[in-house]
Amino acid sequence: MKAAVYDVEGAPGVLQYVDVPDPVAGPDDVLISVEAISIEGGDLINRRSTPPPFPSWIVGYAAAGTVVAVGSKVCSRKVGDRVTAFSMQGSHAERWAVPAERT
């Protein structure tokens, strides 16, 4: 899948749109097919001034989309649900695994 990542802090040019492994929903997660993202102030601040915690850090805090898989412990969501979600990173990708409680 494709995702927006960065390896060093800096201007918008440090962002790259690259292939990364598909995420997998853990037991408490939902896997979302991302259809819309937001660009938050934190995205801008982090990209400009914070080195990523590991290479190819997927940016983004918030997105909307459709649930395509649910973890074994998830009862509050089902495949096909349209959701919005907020978490600490990873929303600027084609798919995003996020705790169900954050949707």
How does the language model describe each region?
Residues 10-15, 41-42, 75:
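Short N-terminal binding/cap micro-motifs at the start of the first secondary-structure element
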Residues 13-18, 63:
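Short beta-strand or tight-loop elements
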Residues 84, 102-103:
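Glycine/small-residue-rich loop that forms an oxyanion/phosphate-binding "nest" at active or ligand-binding sites
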Residues 21-38, 49-90:
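Glycine-rich beta-strand-centered segment in the early N-terminal region that forms part
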Residues 42-48:
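Cytochrome P450 core scaffold surrounding the K-helix E-X-X-R motif
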Residues 87-100:
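A structural motif shared across PLP-dependent enzymes of the aminotransferase-like
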